[in-house]
Amino acid sequence: MDTYTVSFFGHRYIDNPLAIDAALDDLIGTLLRSKEYVEFLVGRNGEFDQLVSSAIRRCKREIRDNNSAHVWVLPYVTADFRDYEDDYRAYYDEIEICNSAGRHYKAAFQARNRNMVDRSDLVVFFVERQEGGAYQTMRYAIQQDKQFINLADSLEEHK
């Protein structure tokens, strides 16, 4: 089976969630319809991550649920994960703990992000500012010559 891997990164706080939601629905729907199997790699550290996971679940329910995996990639195990592991396992198709777990917690996020980029055929960003972890990850994806989309650019064009 041919697996197409997509990872998502964006700012923690989002000003226009409805426009991003629509763009995510279009992109995820297109991927589900056109690819044999899609692995969606996500985090869970802010509003963009929540929008992405909601869009993945919605599109899988409405379009196709037999050719994808919704994978939460954690940089390390948290107390919250331990306390609610059963709930998280019910929400995501798979949960991975990145091998960055032994690093300092701030460095672990960037190590996890780079691992996700390295695995991806497509990297989707929502980066409006030239600062923060999502921006650093976008710079890394560009350096690695990864195919990427910055949804902030496409939303800016439609204003």
Regions found by a protein language model. Give the residues of each.
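Acidic/glycine-enriched connector segments
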Residues: M1-K159
